[in-house]
A protein has these predicted regions:
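A conserved beta-strand->alpha-helix junction
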Residues: 226-253, 340-342
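Conserved G/P- and acidic residue-centered "switch" motifs that form tight phosphate/ATP-binding loops
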Residues: 186
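Short hairpin/turn module used for nucleic-acid contact or packing/dimerization
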Residues: 292, 298-414
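Active-site adenylate/phosphate-handling loop in enzymes that bind or generate adenylated species
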Residues: 126-131, 164, 169-176, 247-248, ...
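A glycine-rich phosphate-binding loop feature that marks nucleotide/adenosyl-phosphate handling sites
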Residues: 48, 241-245, 288, 340-349
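RNA-binding accessory domains that recognize and position tRNA/RNA substrates
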Residues: 1-180, 190-237, 305, 353-358, ...
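Active-site lining segments that contact anionic ligands and/or coordinate catalytic metals
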Residues: 5, 235, 280, 341-343, ...
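Structural beta-sheet core signal
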Residues: 181, 205-207, 240, 285, ...
Length: 414
């Protein structure tokens, strides 16, 4: 009897040269981690594909999870048979029947080696005849058919499929280093975090809470966002910085029109310190050019110069509708639209500066002890750990930075 399996296709990983095996192993580990809730028998490499086999009938449900793992270009629900033509022809009938509505079809056979006596053309003809008998009202169409039945002869086995779903693509998480992301409970920053994860980066979010000036609702929502990104994108640690009191100090010390810029310079500076602790090489934000007052070119430059580490803005050229569409796709939109007071809405000026002058920014920056504030916030920072196979905590964290406090993961909340 043909076994149901998942064939995982990859694109960018396959373009790698001598490092290809390294990327494949990372992707395989990430697929295993994403399928922790499933009864997986094995995850293995076979001639340009990753094969996932199961102890139970779970392939259909597992395919929906696999396609969310960065690095996966496509997932095909396949039947695994031996080289007996009767078996793989019967599997082809099953595969085409499960495809859904169609009027035309084509068979595409491929051999990874030539030790099988039948050629690809022979297999095409053989399987095509059986399908024509099974579906007499359907027509064979060589160009642009509704359904394509693939027959792959690989390493002594045959894999047959017609259904194939697009994955998120990109590179496997853990193949491109570590970044710190400024993660709020809003719409933009979760999308920016996901986009960097899709390029292979291990993301370490830092959330600036309005606590104690506001409730900690946003902290719960950020944790929900992290869970929503899983299991495809697994985040191992969330840093929470209670920023409310410092915002209040800035609001009474600095010119009102420059408050937001001062807030963000402090946030970037704290994130940079955490990046050094974590061994991260960049900061990631959800800024989109011109979307709000703080995201004009002048204001971005005024904030950016507070840190030396690179700042990535993957959404900089996206409009709001594009960002919303992506948030809906990755499952964070509904969480991000829940009302929650946070540091982004706390002590906001009526007329924020939209074209900040650096001289004025530097003067405002010297009106308060920013170094002391950064150190104070770092001492008040807490972190929450989540299940992740890609995140590696800094080994010297507790010895060199005992001020950082671990906090238990919040469970269910109202």
């Amino acid at each position: 009897m043909a076994a149901r399996v998942c064939l995982v296709h990859y694109h960018e990983v396959g373009l790698k040269g001598k490092n290809r095996a390294h990327f494949e192993h990372i992707l395989m580990d990430n697929i295993k981690a994403a399928l922790a809730a499933f009864s997986v028998n094995a995850v293995s490499r076979i001639s340009g594909y990753i094969l996932v086999t199961f102890n139970e009938h779970q392939a259909d449900e597992a395919a929906r999870v696999i396609r969310t793992v960065p690095g996966v270009a496509r997932v095909s629900l396949a039947y695994h048979t031996n080289r007996d033509p009767q078996e793989y022809c019967a599997a082809a009938v099953k595969a085409l029947r499960e495809f859904g509505p169609f009027d035309s079809f084509k068979v595409h056979a491929k051999r990874s080696n030539t030790d099988y006596e039948l050629t690809s053309i022979d297999i095409n003809r053989q399987v095509g005849e059986v399908l024509c008998e099974a579906f007499p009202d359907k027509k064979v169409q060589m160009h642009d058919p509704d359904a394509m039945v693939h027959v792959l002869v690989v390493q002594g086995s045959v894999y047959v499929y017609a259904r194939s779903e697009r994955g998120v693509g990109g590179l496997p998480v853990g193949s491109a280093g570590k970044v710190v992301t400024l993660l709020s409970s809003g719409i933009d920053s979760p999308v920016a975090t996901w986009m960097l994860a899709r390029r292979g980066a291990v993301c370490v979010p830092v959330h600036f809470s309005g606590r104690p000036q506001t409730p900690d609702t946003s902290e719960y929502l950020v944790q929900d966002i992290i869970r929503a990104l899983a299991p495809g994108v697994q985040i191992g640690r969330l840093y929470v910085v209670p920023f409310g009191d410092c915002q209040r100090e800035i609001s009474v010390t600095c010119p009102s029109n420059l408050r937001v810029i001062m807030y963000r310079r402090i946030m970037y500076s704290v994130a940079e310190r955490i990046a050094h602790i974590e061994g991260a090489k960049a900061i990631v934000t959800g800024e989109s050019l011109g979307q709000v007052a703080s995201q004009t070119l002048e204001n971005i430059m005024a904030v950016n110069e507070a840190v030396k580490i690179p700042v990535f803005r993957p959404l900089i050229g996206s409009d709001k509708q594009e960002i919303i569409a992506r948030a809906e796709e990755i499952g964070t939109f509904d969480i991000s639209t829940e009302a929650a007071p946070d540091c982004c809405t706390l002590f906001m000026p009526r007329r924020p500066e939209t074209h900040a002058k650096l001289d004025a920014v530097h003067e405002a920056w010297e009106l308060f002890d920013h170094e002391e504030m950064i150190e104070r916030l770092l001492k008040q920072t807490e972190y929450i750990d989540f299940e992740s196979n890609t995140y590696k905590a800094p080994k010297t964290l507790k010895r060199k930075h005992p001020q950082l406090a671990s906090r238990e993961i919040y469970q269910d909340h109202e």
